[in-house]
């Protein structure tokens, strides 16, 4: 699969920190933000399993996935190796949980989160996550 980078938006909507109201994520405000972003011609959203205390993927389902056609936006999320408590089985558990949380059906991009020297990289190697991710791509 090749990606035509000329068609990619120049600005992504990061979901690591989101507006809150009374200690909860503010869905109404997020919907306004998503609408303004989409209306400006942008469509790339980036989230991760642990963002906003694990609630980012679920709220983007309500603010984006349930409100816009799936082919109108690009969604990226990430596999956190350090949260794969059960090892190899954790890859699929987390991936499937992310599909459920987002309701997206598929991810346009799926990243191995925080691949760096040390424990994270070693964990990705130990649990064969690089090959696993390539198979998911197919």
Task: Annotate the PLM regions.
Residues 16-28, 78-90, 118-122:
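Active-site mouth loops of central-metabolism enzymes
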Residues 35, 85-138:
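Glycine/proline-rich, positively charged
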Residues 17, 67-70, 78, 101, ...:
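Basic side chains
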Residues 71-83, 110-113:
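A short, structured active-site edge motif that brings together acidic residues
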Residues 1-73, 132:
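N-terminal binding-site loop/beta-alpha segment at the start of enzyme catalytic domains
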Residues 41-46, 75-77, 105-110:
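Short C-terminal domain-edge/linker segments immediately following a structured domain
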Residues 9-12, 80, 138:
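Residue-level detector of intrinsically disordered/flexible regions characterized by low predicted structural confidence
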Residues 18, 50, 81, 104, ...:
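Flexible cofactor-recognition loop at the NAD(P)H-binding site
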């Amino acid at each position: 699969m090749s990606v035509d980078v000329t068609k990619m938006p120049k600005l992504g909507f990061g979901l690591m920190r989101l507006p809150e109201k009374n200690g909860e994520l503010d869905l109404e405000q997020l919907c306004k933000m998503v609408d303004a972003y989409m209306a400006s011609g942008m469509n790339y959203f980036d989230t991760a399993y642990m963002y906003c205390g694990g609630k980012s993927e679920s709220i983007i389902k309500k603010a984006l996935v349930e409100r816009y056609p799936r082919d109108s936006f690009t969604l990226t999320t990430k596999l956190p190796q350090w949260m794969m408590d059960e090892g190899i089985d954790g890859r699929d558990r987390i991936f499937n949980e992310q599909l459920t949380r987002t309701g997206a059906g598929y991810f346009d991009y799926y990243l191995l989160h925080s691949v760096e020297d040390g424990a994270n990289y070693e964990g990705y190697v130990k649990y064969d996550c690089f090959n696993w991710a390539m198979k998911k791509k197919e």
